[in-house]
Amino acid sequence: MTALVLIAALDRKHAIGRDNALPWRLSDDLKRFKALTLGKPLLMGRKTAQSLGRALPGRRNLVLTRSGEVPFAGMEAVGSTEQALELARADGAAELCVIGGGEIYALCLPSASRMHLTRVDTEVEGADTFFPRFDRDEWREVARESHRADERNEFDVEYVEYVRLGMD
């Protein structure tokens, strides 16, 4: 069975975006994102797909959209999370990585079995996209790693991995 895995970076108030862009510069988090997703299918919304500027190489780029249109070559339109899961399953993928935005996270959260969250130690002014609140009692933290800000990483971060209770 293909697991639904949410991957996101969020601030203290769950902000994940501003003006269709990431509101921070975190080089190490981008490297971590690549390591977590390379070779796996991705599910994203249309705005997230547009913000990427291109299809991410080495990954199947699935865009959840009602219109059936995708912004860039190398991306595929899907009409539902079920369709995305079917495609991932047909490819033999163990995980379907959900990478945003806010509406897609909210849609997928009830079915997700794992989350890789980057907790960014800041509060974004003017944020307009948010990761959904979730019931901590339904999740078990299985890993946490702290990193300090430096010349390539604008803020302190914590990488936290959660597994839904009963799914580990």
Language-model features: where?
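Flexible, gly/pro- and Lys/Arg-enriched active-site loops
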Residues: 4-168
